[in-house]
From Swiss-Prot:
Membrane-spanning residues: none
Species this protein is from: Rickettsia typhi (strain ATCC VR-144 / Wilmington)
Coiled-coil intervals, chain numbering: none
InterPro entries from the UniProt entry: Fmt, Formyl_trans_C, Formyl_transf_N, Formyl_transf_N_sf, Formyl_transferase-like_C_sf, Met-tRNA-FMT_C, Met-tRNA-FMT_N
Alphabetized CDD domains for the sequence: FMT_core_Met-tRNA-FMT_N, Met_tRNA_FMT_C
NCBIfam families recorded: fmt
Protein name as annotated: Methionyl-tRNA formyltransferase
Role of this protein: Attaches a formyl group to the free amino group of methionyl-tRNA(fMet). The formyl group appears to play a dual role in the initiator identity of N-formylmethionyl-tRNA by promoting its recognition by IF2 and preventing the misappropriation of this tRNA by the elongation apparatus.
Gene name in the database record: fmt
UniProt keyword list: Protein biosynthesis, Transferase
Molecular-function annotations in GO: methionyl-tRNA formyltransferase activity
GO cellular component, one term: cytosol
Residue positions binding (6S)-5,6,7,8-tetrahydrofolate: 108-111
Enzyme class, first EC level, given as a word: transferase
The family this protein is said to belong to: Belongs to the Fmt family.
Amino acid sequence: MKVIFMGTPEFAVPTLKKLIIHHEVKAVFTQQPKAKGRGLYLAKSPIHQLAFEHQIPVYSPSTLRNDETINLINKVDADIIVVIAYGFIVPKAILEAKKYGCLNIHPSDLPRHRGAAPLQRTIIEGDLKSSVCIMRMDSGLDTGDILLKEDLNLEKRITLDELSNRCAHLGAELLIQTLANIDNIVPVKQSSNGVTYAHKLTKAEGKINWYESAYSIDCKIRGMNPWPGAYFSYNDKIIKILEAEYLNYNHHFIPGTVISNKLEIACGSGILRVTKLQQESKKALNIEAFLRGTNILKDTILK
């Protein structure tokens, strides 16, 4: 099948690799190179790099909502468009531009976690089950019919990297299966029950509320690493917690109290034992190395 591929981050790479092997990728659309590093060099997206290596034409328009881009897509000889974490809303004119429309890989149990950050919200909310869906896109926000779906059981302390890697590779396999049977698949409409929205994360959400349970804070730490990071402030410095453990211990301390010299912190329920953290503008350190340079005393109440 002749395919136009739209995607940007590492999450989309396994699918593009599979499409290159099994189908004919006619064009790739990805976000424009972004300034990176101290020298502010222009870094191509992972998808741009992969397409370049395989000599596939690459386009990086600033928007899909203009006649120039729509006309370009109409001119590409393709049967279908595959969209994964592209970063732009796809207008109706493009959704309907090809015979089989636009397919999307969405890593959640739709209609739960529609939106921009399903992987992060799955972890932050402590979900122990999820899914990967192949969806035919429509004009709504992740409201399209489901062509194929596979459920996942999640480990209680799964990290964002682990979940992303698992869903990316499963999604690639499911998409290839979908394309092989696309003329025979009966689309399934999404339920109107259980709809939630996985809104894009904000930096403000990363601030830790010590009155939450230790487990809830641990979920936030795992779901927000690397960005925006779950953080607290100490001596007017922002400190991100990169890794921690939660302990279901009863206690009588005010939430936010440091109860040991190993940075164990009382929460609304339970204790959070910090194991890796990073002060703003400094490198990440394990707890022992961090405490050698920043002494957070027992009985300190963190804000």
